[in-house]
Amino acid sequence: MSREILRIATRSSPLAIWQAEYVQQRLESLHEGLRVELVRIKTQGDKILDTPLAKIGGKGLFVKELEEAMMDGRADIAVHSMKDVPMELPPGFALPVICEREDPRDAFVSNTFDGLSSLPHGACVGTSSLRRQAQVKANRPDLVVNSLRGNVQTRLGKLDAGNFDAIILAAAGLKRLEMHDRIRYEMPPEESLPAVGQGAVGIECREGDESTIELLSPLSDVDTWDRVVAERAMNRRLEGGCQVPIAGFALLEDGQLWLRGLVAEEDGSRVLRAEGTAPRGQGAELGIDIAEQLLAQGADEILKALYARQ
């Protein structure tokens, strides 16, 4: 193997560093003599915490500056949370690998209460996600949902300071950071359908960089790939960004994909759902079919109105 050093562009949050170090360790264990270095980047999305993501460019902010590091030669690959990766990559980039998925569910976190149903009338729930907000309000219209941004530790600190009665985070992030004990309740998909790609880590590189793609290929998990492809195909057909109340979650069992999709009003007053199955090799077609079902129910009206307000 001719390459001796591979550089990973990563956000500088603890969870992003965990994900990059996971890839670093896997690559170094697979390829003797390869040294993998981390290039830490504090993105605009990490710096601007007092404004909703939708108003400053969406979650693509977390990806764009890592791509710039690859383009100008500071890094060879970038490691992302798949739920942050835009549906369309810019020209010149490829996403050849999706690693094995961690728990994709949302986690209910509280120091006092055991779940949404146990919260008192008018309790305050924190989340940065319109998808979570919509589903919380659909289940409990009486609750107050306020924006909560920052890394995992920052969000937990705001809960502990008494700013919220409960917060909702991705279970995967808490588990990767060995904070399992903070999870009071893992929310089933029926209560809070996860974000597209939630819990999965993707690796991006320059298009046509075959030597790098060859190094990365053993990290790809085909089951996770097939599930996330179906979820992202649905989101792409809906023309959904990362900061919209869209959920998509695929399971794989006995060679069959089962995809559930959701589009909702921000306030939870209207929730559209669709689901279907297909053989695992037809995930993209399944995703489009579920999106078409949602559009037939009026998803486009909900999304157009949302974009007009943002």
Swiss-Prot record:
Keyword annotations from UniProtKB, A to Z: Porphyrin biosynthesis, Transferase
One of the GO biological process terms: protoporphyrinogen IX biosynthetic process
GO molecular function: hydroxymethylbilane synthase activity
InterPro entries, per database record: HemC, Porphobilin_deaminase_cofac_BS, Porphobilin_deaminase_N, Porphobilinogen_deaminase_C, Porphobilinogen_deaminase_C_sf
Cofactor(s) listed: dipyrromethane
Protein origin, superkingdom: Bacteria
CDD domains to which the protein is assigned, alphabetical: PBP2_EcHMBS_like
One protein family per Pfam: Porphobil_deamC
Pathway field: Porphyrin-containing compound metabolism; protoporphyrin-IX biosynthesis; coproporphyrinogen-III from 5-aminolevulinate: step 2/4
UniProt xrefs under SUPFAM superfamilies: Periplasmic binding protein-like II (SSF53850), Porphobilinogen deaminase (hydroxymethylbilane synthase), C-terminal domain (SSF54782)
Enzyme Commission number(s) of this protein: 2.5.1.61
Cellular-component GO terms for this entry: cytoplasm
Other facts noted in the record for this chain: The porphobilinogen subunits are added to the dipyrromethane group.
Assembly with partners or alone: Monomer.
This protein's name: Porphobilinogen deaminase
Classification of source organism: Bacteria, Pseudomonadati, Pseudomonadota, Gammaproteobacteria, Oceanospirillales
